[in-house]
Every structure is written in C-alpha cells, then in structure tokens.
A protein has these predicted regions:
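Stable alpha-helical elements in mature extracytoplasmic
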Residues: 27-31, 78-82, 118-125
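An anionic, turn-rich surface loop/hairpin at beta-sheet edges
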Residues: 52-53, 80-101
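Sec/Tat-exported extracytoplasmic proteins
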Residues: 35-42, 77, 90, 126-130
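C-terminal motif of bacterial Sec signal peptides marking the signal peptidase cleavage site
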Residues: 17-18
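A short, solvent-exposed beta-edge/loop patch
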Residues: 91-130
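Bacterial N-terminal signal peptides that target proteins for export
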Residues: 1-7
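A short acidic-to-branched-hydrophobic micro-motif
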Residues: 63-81
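N-terminal secretory signal peptides
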Residues: 30-62
Length: 130
C-alpha cells in the first residue's frame, strides 16, 4: 500500500510540474512582442514602477487606446512567490482600497484588461506567453 501511495505522489508531482507555466525568464516588455506576433497593434510600451503592487518589474503596454499593466513577480524569490500566490487566490489587486480584477499567467499579472476593446485577442496571447 505504501509503495502505491509513493508512486501516486511521484506521478502527481510530475504532472503538476509539467503543467506549471514557466515564463519567469521573460520581461514585461516581451509581452508586447508576443502581441505583435499575434497581429495585435501595439501603440506603445513603457516601463512603470513595479512598487505599487510589490512586483519585481513592470511595463505598460498600450493596445486599442487603452493601457495594460504587465507586472512580473520573480518566482525564484520566496516573498515574490508568496505575493503572487496571494494575488492568484484573490484574483484582484487594490489601489487605494478599490479592488481591480487581474489575470495571472505564470510569473505575470495583467492589469486593466476588463475595459480593453481587444480583450479577447489579448487573452489568447496571454495563454501563449511562455
């Protein structure tokens, strides 16, 4: 019985690591390149301070006259990994106590998608961002 449990837990661990998204090596600015490759017109890309959301890096990508915040959390650092896990559970970030919905994919949090006219296309690109 113990042998079966060990095999089951080993297979479960193998499956979980195989399904995880590993995009920690990418930069927030790289997301703009992925959008362009998918035929989405990127109007501008600029660095923004990552401090408000305690991220390690951040950029604002303008698509369809609307900016998307792309925040990277370095998952090799324990504090960043815990913060990202908290955001995954909450599915929102707060600015002055006001909650805003976010999308999480791998090491990245995407902010400001809800009102973007190209939201569906951008979401498809997010799923390829690794």
């Amino acid at each position: 019985m113990r042998h079966r449990m060990w095999i089951f837990s080993a297979l479960l661990t193998l499956f979980a690591t195989g399904c995880a998204v590993n995009n920690n090596y990418l930069r927030p600015e790289d997301f703009a390149d992925y959008l362009r490759r998918d035929g989405i017109r990127v109007e501008s890309v600029r660095k923004v301070p990552p401090d408000p959301f305690r991220a390690s890096d951040a950029a604002a990508v303008k698509v369809a006259d609307s900016e998307i915040g792309v925040y990277k959390y370095d998952t090799t650092a324990g504090a960043q990994r815990r913060r990202l896990k908290w955001i995954e559970n909450e599915k929102r970030l707060y600015i002055n106590g006001i909650p805003y919905p976010v999308r999480i994919y791998g090491s990245f949090v995407f902010f400001g998608l809800e009102r973007n006219p190209a939201k569906r296309k951008i979401l498809r690109t997010i799923e390829k961002f690794n």
